[in-house]
Swiss-Prot record:
Probably involved in the osmoprotection via the biosynthesis of trehalose. Catalyzes the transfer of glucose from UDP-alpha-D-glucose (UDP-Glc) to D-glucose 6-phosphate (Glc-6-P) to form trehalose-6-phosphate. Acts with retention of the anomeric configuration of the UDP-sugar donor. It comes from the Bacteria. Its EC number is 2.4.1.15. Homotetramer. It catalyses: D-glucose 6-phosphate + UDP-alpha-D-glucose = alpha,alpha-trehalose 6-phosphate + UDP + H(+). It is an enzyme of class 2 (transferase). The record marks 86, 156 as: Involved in alpha anomer selectivity. One of its GO terms (molecular function) is alpha,alpha-trehalose-phosphate synthase (UDP-forming) activity. This is Trehalose-6-phosphate synthase. UDP-alpha-D-glucose binds at residues 22-23, 263, 268, 340, 366-370.
């Protein structure tokens, strides 16, 4: 039976409870347990890159990790992955800081990873590579003679050609991505954007069985919306409340609660959300003294200027809004720039009347799905969701809004706060069915099934494809 080899920027080793808490780790571990295999990635430590791989084995899974030098980590991770790809793929070209040295560092680390992984690969292994840190990774493996099936899943959006083509290395990245056998995206929009970028750069041909050929390389593309563990979240949210949370719930029983949580990031639309809440208070004064909006946004990449700026902006806006609309005994907006235990947040989701999830751009946004899963089906809250989150393609029974339109968001909040129980139950039931169907295990099983059906590459087949395709002439 073929093994599965998973490669990601960071791994979740079995002895690290913090890193293994997320839903992605659950999905990857489920796939690894089913097939047996290897999880390969950065250790999270700055150190000697020539040091032997650190390996841990539990049952049929081995975790293998490596160190990065300070320079390589800075150029590969901070400067290029998060300084170029992250803002560009989230449609923020104004925040892109492209430096040729960072691009070279990004390629160097992908090459280093390929050198370290190649000796561990067995002939019939299936490889599954994750996210924007590793766009050129398959290309590096192919250079080293690896012809195994290699799949790739992009967790963030893929931008349209107008955005992507602004990157100085757009052509190189596209050609490198074509070295994957299967490219998975969160939404059809992302998949289409990738193919549109290719069609503008080179000759893109399509076969009757759904294969694409570009740059002399053949690959498949598909949509795999990532999911969550709905039953685990339902259990966590329904359990007894800790004493402090029980006291808080009692104190807030007289008001309706709007709740949001995400890491502090410019893609999440937090300043626009604060402005929309202010518009709600301005245009719908009947809610004064009767609602409370709590925004939890723990610091993310706090050493980056763009993140420092947004934190300062939110702190200023929260103070201004509370100063303008607050009353003795009523503070309309609570902004908490700190981390909370995930299981505790699921309980908070359950007693919130409105879940407000309005990113400006998001690959999926699992918080929206977690909010749905955490609700009491007999008395659920209402989800207000950005139309630019990948989750909006599935959770169509949410109140979908344009996060750039503060009046639209304010009107949706007013509607959510006034929504009758029967409508809340109907909307929640429809969304919960989708969340349960497209859970994290369905996601990984669908991807692995399709990857296994790919015909492995061979030198003869690649030569035929190169003869059949050629770049577009200028």
């Amino acid at each position: 039976m073929s093994r599965l080899v998973v490669v990601s920027n960071r791994i979740a080793p079995p002895d690290d409870k913090k890193s293994s808490a997320g839903g992605l780790a659950v999905g990857i571990l489920g796939a690894l347990k089913a097939a047996g295999g290897l999880w390969f990635g950065w250790s999270g430590e700055i150190g000697n890159e020539d040091a032997p791989l650190k390996k841990v084995t539990r049952d049929n899974i081995t975790w293998a990790s490596f160190n990065l030098s300070e320079q390589d980590h800075d150029q590969y991770y901070n400067q290029f992955s998060n300084g170029v790809l992250w803002p560009a793929f989230h449609y923020r070209l104004d925040l892109v800081n492209f430096q040729r040295e960072a691009w070279e560092g990004y390629l160097r680390v992908n090459s280093l990873l390929a050198d370290k992984l190649k000796p561990l690969i067995e002939p019939d292994d299936n490889l599954w590579i994750h996210d924007y840190h590793l766009l050129p990774f398959a290309s590096e493996l192919r250079k080293r003679g690896v012809n195994n099936r290699i799949g790739f899943f992009l967790h963030i959006p893929f931008p349209t050609p107008e955005i992507f083509n602004a990157l100085p290395t757009n052509t190189e990245l596209l050609e490198q991505l074509c070295d994957y056998d299967l490219l998975g995206f969160q939404t059809e929009n992302d998949r289409t954007a990738f193919l549109d970028c290719l069609a503008m750069q080179t000759h893109l041909s399509t076969s009757s069985d759904g294969e694409y050929t570009a740059y002399g390389k053949t690959f498949r593309t598909e949509v795999y919306p990532i999911g969550i563990e709905p039953e685990e979240i339902a259990q966590a949210s329904a359990g007894p409340l800790p004493p402090k949370l029980a006291q808080l719930k009692a104190e807030l029983a007289s008001v309706k609660n709007i709740f949001s949580v995400e890491r502090l990031d410019y893609s999440k639309g937090l300043p626009e959300r604060f402005q929309a809440f202010e518009t709600l208070l301005e245009k719908y004064p009947e809610h004064h003294g009767k609602i409370r909006y709590t925004q939890i946004a723990p610091t993310s990449r706090g050493d980056v200027q763009a993140y420092q700026d947004i934190r300062h902006q939110l702190e200023t806006e929260a103070g201004r809004i509370n100063g303008k609309y607050g009353q003795l005994g009523w503070t309309p907006l609570y902004y908490l720039n700190q981390h909370f235990d995930r299981k505790l947040l699921m309980k908070v989701f359950r007693y919130s009347d409105v879940g407000l999830v309005t990113p400006l751009r998001d690959g999926m946004n699992l918080v929206a799905k977690e909010y749905v899963a955490a609700q009491d089906p007999k008395n659920p809250g209402v989800l207000v969701l950005s139309q630019f989150a990948g989750a909006a393609n599935e959770l169509t029974a949410a109140l979908l809004v344009n996060p750039y339109d503060r009046d639209d968001v304010a009107a949706a909040l007013d509607r959510a706060l006034k929504m009758p129980l029967a409508e809340r139950i109907a909307r929640h039931s429809e969304m919960l069915e989708i969340v349960r169907k497209n859970d994290i295990n369905h996601w990984q099983e669908a991807f692995i099934k399709d990857l296994k059906q790919v015909t492995p590459r061979s030198p003869e087949r690649e030569l035929q494809n190169k003869v059949a395709t050629f770049p577009k002439l200028a």
